[in-house]
């Protein structure tokens, strides 16, 4: 669906196995749109990370640019 198309990840780690097992390790106020297993802590703002694993990585978000715009 659209959630998978819009999902993105800046930092994706994969195992060397075939097929690889990949996980997005981005930390943010929410998980990407296609995440099924999102874990957040209770800080303010929350720090969330997706624990889904896939055989691929999502495209990069370039979230660092967006974060700079929000901070200024």
UniProtKB/Swiss-Prot annotation:
UniProtKB keywords: Disulfide bond, Protease inhibitor, Serine protease inhibitor
Annotated site, Reactive bond for chymotrypsin, chain positions: 42-43
GO cellular component terms given for this protein: extracellular region
Entry keyword annotation includes Metal-binding: no
Listed PROSITE patterns: BOWMAN_BIRK
Site (Reactive bond for trypsin): 16-17
InterPro entries: Bowman-Birk_prot_inh, Prot_inh_BBI
SUPFAM superfamilies: Bowman-Birk inhibitor, BBI
Disulfide links within the chain: 8-61, 9-24, 12-57, 14-22, 31-38, 35-50, 40-48
Gene3D superfamilies: Cysteine Protease (Bromelain) Inhibitor, subunit H
GO molecular function terms listed in the Swiss-Prot or TrEMBL record: serine-type endopeptidase inhibitor activity
Superkingdom field: Eukaryota
Protein family membership: Belongs to the Bowman-Birk serine protease inhibitor family.
Protein role: This inhibitor has two domains, each with separate antiprotease activity. 1 mole of inhibitor inhibits either 1 mole of trypsin or 2 moles of chymotrypsin, stoichiometrically.
Name the UniProt record assigns to this protein: Bowman-Birk type proteinase inhibitor
Organism name: Vicia sativa subsp. nigra
Lineage: Eukaryota, Viridiplantae, Streptophyta, Embryophyta, Tracheophyta
């Amino acid at each position: 669906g659209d959630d998978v198309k819009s999902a993105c990840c800046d930092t994706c780690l994969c195992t060397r196995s075939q097929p690889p097992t990949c996980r997005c390790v981005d930390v943010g106020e929410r998980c990407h749109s296609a995440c099924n297993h999102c874990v957040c802590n209770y800080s303010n703002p929350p720090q969330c990370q997706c624990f889904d694993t896939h055989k691929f990585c999502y495209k990069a978000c370039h979230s660092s640019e967006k974060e700079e715009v929000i901070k200024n």
